Curated annotation (Swiss-Prot):
Gene Ontology terms describing biological process: protein unfolding; proteolysis involved in protein catabolic process
Family: Belongs to the ClpX chaperone family. HslU subfamily.
Function comment: ATPase subunit of a proteasome-like degradation complex; this subunit has chaperone activity. The binding of ATP and its subsequent hydrolysis by HslU are essential for unfolding of protein substrates subsequently hydrolyzed by HslV. HslU recognizes the N-terminal part of its protein substrates and unfolds these before they are guided to HslV for hydrolysis.
Oligomer and partners: A double ring-shaped homohexamer of HslV is capped on each side by a ring-shaped HslU homohexamer. The assembly of the HslU/HslV complex is dependent on binding of ATP.
Record flagged with keyword Membrane: no
Cellular localisation: Cytoplasm
Species of provenance: Cytophaga hutchinsonii (strain ATCC 33406 / DSM 1761 / CIP 103989 / NBRC 15051 / NCIMB 9469 / D465)
Record flagged with keyword Zinc: no
Gene Ontology molecular-function annotations: ATP binding; ATP hydrolysis activity; peptidase activity; proteasome-activating activity
Major localisation: cytoplasm
InterPro entries assigned: AAA+_ATPase (IPR003593), ATP-dep_Clp_protease_ClpX (IPR050052), ATPase_AAA_core (IPR003959), Clp_ATPase_C (IPR019489), HslU (IPR004491), P-loop_NTPase (IPR027417)
GO cellular component terms listed in the entry, alphabetical order: HslUV protease complex
Name this polypeptide is given: ATP-dependent protease ATPase subunit HslU
Keywords carried by this UniProt record: ATP-binding, Chaperone, Cytoplasm, Nucleotide-binding, Stress response
Amino acid sequence: MTALQGFLTPTEIVAELDKYIIGQHDAKRNVAIALRNRWRRMHADADMRKEIMPNNILLIGPTGVGKTEIARRLAKLADAPFTKVEASKFTEVGYVGRDVESMVRDLVEQAVNMVKTQKKEEVKIKVSQVVEDILLDLLIPPVKSTGMGFKTASTQSIDTNEIPDNDQELNERTRELFREKIRSGELDERKVEINVQQQGPGVGVVGGAMDEASMMNIQEMIGNMMPKKTKKRKLSIAEARKILLEEESAKLIDMDDVKDEAIRKTENMGIIFIDEIDKVASSKKGNGPDVSREGVQRDLLPIVEGSAVNTKYGTVHTDHILFIAAGAFHVSKPSDLIPELQGRFPIRVELNSLTEADFYHILKEPKNALTRQYQALLSSENVNIEFHDDALKAISEIAFELNVEVENIGARRLHTVMSHLLNELLFDVPDKIETHSTVVITKELVDQKLKGLVKNRDLSQFIL
């Protein structure tokens, strides 16, 4: 699917999201359109391309119904830089706390890491060969010429029926034998001594009137001026290979290209998910001052509208970044946001609270369903676990009942219920339960473990 990621149709995007998220079709439909519009914009006439702005989305719904998961899966589908921030963590400029521009810097950081990973993949074969040769040189140094003829620096020998012509041929054969052993992992525990670059001490800069990006640039510049120190370390070949792969990859990757591509990726494909947007909305009911709530909204406005943000990798224009905001809006309403910010989130989608039937489907259908996760965990101990259908229905009923009576935390309730149900089993494996055995979870077992707790409301508040 990698080659076609940018070309998925809205129907295909929804089908992909359906593999992981149950229900919420309106939300899936709208994010699918937003993602496809990215591709449409990139293929529009050059004159109009700059004029087409993304339609930002506001997701409204209680916790645990899939708001964050929809945004995260969308970013994976698009192979796009993605960052999640909480609006309540930001403060108005001038107050102590994170400023809103830091979300763009986080997004660029994600993009840089993505591009670096792609570039490393491109040079992987070449770098692997270089690292292999370095490790071989450490184990079997090549033959050096002396005044007395050729002498090998290695005393290693190999089993062969043929008598080598000279030391150089023996050395080559030994190296090839060791090359195969390195590739197969046979020598992973063998110790070698390598020079490792040491990280220089952190350089502190007193901010004063400087913004965060300027301070980071100065810190990086001073850090680059410091001499690079190396230290000899004795490591296993497995550990040495990891370090050498990083160092040799860095030599082949042009960081200027990485920065340029990362900024392009951020500007045209970046997705910022702003959670808890309702926490910075003023409900207008309180008499006290709303400390910096409206200020945070006003600081958010230019970022969402489109502005230039300085980062340590360069200037990023936020005009075409897709913003997805989410909030429960229990106390406040979307209309409590300042009008200018409301206007920047033209698409509003209300997500439904999860029903008992939804819980059942969540346990059974998604690729990453909780039941499959527990099966994968126990399979590592060679124990198989099976869930009867009526057991899944009983778990769903209990989770739904607890959400109604205690606190509605959405699908996260399934985690607490399943954890309590399987607690004893997870503790007993492998000491009391034999390997290659099968454990069956029945409705009777679910009732035995959970029904009593659900009936005791005071206890269920603390345990489930």
